[in-house]
Amino acid sequence: MEPFQAKLTMAALKAAENVDAYFASLAEELFQYYVIQKGKTQYWLTDIEFYLYHKQRRDIITYPRNCKAGEWFFHPSGVDIAFESFVRKEGKKPTLTDDAFFGGILVRGIQKKDPKGDILFDGPMLACEELFDKFDAFEEVENFPKLVRVAQALPYEKPEPEKRFNLKKNAEEKVSSILANNYEPLRDEHLKDELIQAYRQFWDKEYRYKRYSR
C-alpha cells in the first residue's frame, strides 16, 4: 500500500490522538507532495474538506460509503478521496449502527497545469466533472485520474483552515433531511437526538483547507 494511502485506513485514523491535527497533516502532505494525473495532464489540489463519521464523532454530514482507503468515491456533492469505510447495508439504503466508520476528503478545487496558463476549477462539481468527464464504455479505461506523489515539494501557502462550505445552522431540519435521504429508518429512537447534538458540534468545524491564501 502506498504510504499516504495507509494514512487513510481505519487503523491509522483510530490511532490518531488528535483528529483535527491529523486532518491538517494530511492536507499539508496532499498539497505539497501529490498531484492528480490524468493522462499527460497534471492537476494540483487547491481546496479540500475533511469528513469522518463513527460512534465517537457522529459527523452526520458525511456521506455513508463502503470503500477501501484511497478509492475515489462519488456522491451528490462531487468526489472524495475515501478513507477506509464501512457501513451496514441491509436494504436499499445504509443502516446506521455503532460499528459504522466512514469518511473522506472532498475535492473542492483543482488547478490544471497548462503551459499556456493554468486553469482553476473552483467548486466540487466543476472539479469532479473536469476529472471524470467521460470514459469509454466498451474498452479498457485509459487516462483514469490517479493520485501521484512528486519528488519535490509543491507551493503551499498554508492559510488557516476554514469552516466547511455552506453547512446550515438548523440542526433538526438538516439531520432529518440527511436521515430521510441517505439511511434506512433508525433502530434507536434516541440516536436522532444524539445526531442533532453532534451536528451542532461539528457544523462549524474548520475542516476546509486551501493551497493559497487568497
Where are these regions (language model features)?
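A cross-family signal for N-terminal binding/gating loops and helix N-caps
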Residues: M1-R214
